[in-house]
Curated annotation (Swiss-Prot):
Its EC number is 1.18.1.2. Residues 83-205 form the FAD-binding FR-type domain. It comes from Nicotiana tabacum (Common tobacco). NADP(+) binds at residues 144, 164, 220, 252-253, 282-283, 292, 321-322, 360. Belongs to the ferredoxin--NADP reductase type 1 family. It is a peripheral membrane protein. Residues 1-62 form a transit peptide. Its main location: plastid. This is Ferredoxin--NADP reductase, leaf-type isozyme, chloroplastic. The lineage of its organism: Eukaryota, Viridiplantae, Streptophyta, Embryophyta, Tracheophyta. One of its GO terms (biological process) is photosynthesis. Residues 10-20 have a biased composition (Low complexity).
Length: 362
């Protein structure tokens, strides 16, 4: 807590007149104020003692309200909670990966009648039907919204998700199915779904319509960026028109796993000066060294340009997807920063504080 010190100093002259001075000091450290005799020399006579009267208060200075660089005005969180979820209905559920893709991913649209006021970059929770092994309701699972606030139908009455069906073999050789992902991927139109939220402010879009927005996604981590890009390039808003640069890097294992490819290519055709698109298909592509093309491998091909952009105060990085992607991206940035005598870990902290480095991995 800051401490305010107010000191009154009286300097009596040989003619019995007095001079009074008052000052205030704000210090962020604790102040130990000791009474110390202070002398001054009066040119008309000898030295005289100055008396000091101190008043110490512990009133904190008024906090300066931080102004966010993101579109956070009026953002609502946790309108619906697990005990009282919103009950929506499935309107559409379709598989968006090829039959030969390693795993299924589904795009689904739920009716909300405008009751779940999410924003681009937020998430919603879903509670699967049924109970767990202990007879209790299943815990909610969070999913990034894959639609803009207007929804896929443009009427602000729906929300869309992008969900991969989780199926794996455990240590005992048994097939295990993720409860919520399989519940969602199996939903039929008309079925009810319990929704909580919306939640999250980390991944909200930047306010600046002239910003450079670099999006790094693996797999279903594409969801929030689809919502960004729909708002940027497929919609018209009275209070928002994107004039900056949106650059999407999407990493997947096979071409049949590329999500929303046709949509993104249409956006590129519509706004070639504002939208850049780079895919990294690890099982099918390699770089000039013959290395598999992961998302960080693709980024390395643009390392100099990315580093230059990252040093501008209107460049925003968003990362969403598998947790493993973060290390590879950090390694690229660390090498570039070191070349300029910068410690990447410290620089990244500054970017996070400035809301320019935003991560949501799982």
């Amino acid at each position: 807590m800051a401490t305010a010190v107010s000191a009154a100093v009286s300097l009596p002259s040989s003619k019995s007149t007095s001079f009074s001075s008052r000052t205030s000091i704000i210090s962020t450290d604790k102040i130990n104020f000791n009474k110390v005799p202070l002398y001054y020399r009066n040119v008309s006579g000898g030295s005289r003692l100055v008396s000091i009267r101190a008043q110490v208060t512990t009133e904190a200075p008024a906090k300066v309200e931080k102004i966010s660089k993101k579109q956070d005005e009026g953002v609502i969180v946790n309108k619906f909670r697990p005990k009282e979820p919103y009950v929506g209905r499935c309107l559409l559920n379709t598989k968006i990966t090829g039959d030969d893709a390693p795993g299924e991913t589904w795009h689904m649209v739920f009716s909300t009648e405008g009751e779940v006021p999410y924003r681009e970059g937020q998430s919603i929770g879903v509670i699967a039907d049924g109970v767990d092994a202990n007879g209790k309701p299943h815990k909610l699972r969070l999913y990034s919204t894959a639609s803009s606030a207007l929804g896929d139908f443009g009427d602000s009455k729906t929300v869309s998700l992008c969900v991969k069906r989780l199926v794996y073999t455990n240590d005992k050789g048994e097939e295990v199915k993720g409860v919520c992902s399989n519940f969602l991927c199996d939903l039929k139109p008309g079925a009810e779904v319990k929704i909580t939220g919306p939640v999250g402010k980390e991944m909200l879009m930047p306010k600046d319509p002239n910003a450079t927005v670099i999006m790094l996604a693996t797999g279903t981590g594409i969801a929030p960026f689809r919502s960004f890009l729909w708002k940027m390039f497929f919609e018209k808003h009275e209070d928002y028109k994107f004039n900056g640069t949106a650059w999407l890097f999407l990493g997947v294992p096979t071409s049949s796993s590329l999500l929303y490819k046709e949509e993104f290519e249409k956006m590129k055709e519509k706004a070639p000066e504002n939208f850049r698109l780079d895919f990294a298909v690890s099982r099918e592509q390699t770089n000039e060294k013959g290395e598999k093309m992961y998302i960080q491998t693709r980024m390395a091909q643009y390392a100099e340009e990315l580093w230059t952009l990252l040093q501008k105060d209107n460049t925003f990085i968003y990362m969403c997807g598998l947790k493993g992607m973060e290390q590879g991206i950090d390694e690229i940035m660390s090498a570039l920063a070191e070349r300029d005598g910068i410690v990447w870990a410290d620089y990244k902290k500054q970017l996070k504080k400035a809301e320019q480095w935003n991560v949501e991995v799982y």
